[in-house]
């Protein structure tokens, strides 16, 4: 009798387990179906049906809105929920170095706003001995890109040999030092009117001074490793050069030598090599 009761009890438990398992499976299937249905409804709401109304792109001077729309795949029929905007942003910035940043704002479910920030060129790049405009420019971060729109009046860095720093790359070493030199002249030492920096020489940068087209050979401690510390050395050298240049100690000087530390040149600032037209500061 007891044995029958035990068997009956065990059989009841098994039935409950089976029933519970079936109910769990049914619930999981139901949830999956419901999730997929809800997902389909959501995806349907994210489709671009009117790109002009649903997509807003603020472009720049060089990179146009249609290019950005193409790179991101923003067109009628595209689904905003299926676009990996972070990945598209990275790909676009890699392919178009003119772009400094891209801001993306989603307005769920079916709108998106994109703002493009372009790089601002501060110098042109060329090759020593070549007159042809390469179209290469660099911004204050040293990133090289192509731009010919309104860049003719920018100062130029002459690299030693072709092809020079390619677009999409960043200036380094002596080229970056020349960029910092020209920017510092523009911001703090305008009396020099520096318009060109030739980095083909191993020991110094040759700078053309725009007021009279005289030449200045400039070097400073740590010039090939630009940093806040070495920037101070550059500023000291330019300050010393500016004082000598504006004092017009000798109008026959066509080449200024600013390669020595100021401490070594104070006693020699009036010394001029007449035959070679080289002046020590």
Annotate the PLM regions.
Residues 60:
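Conserved glycine-rich "GG(E/T)P / GGGxP" loop and the immediately following alpha-helix
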Residues 1-55, 66, 70-91, 100-281:
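Charged, solvent-exposed interaction patches on well-folded alpha/beta domains
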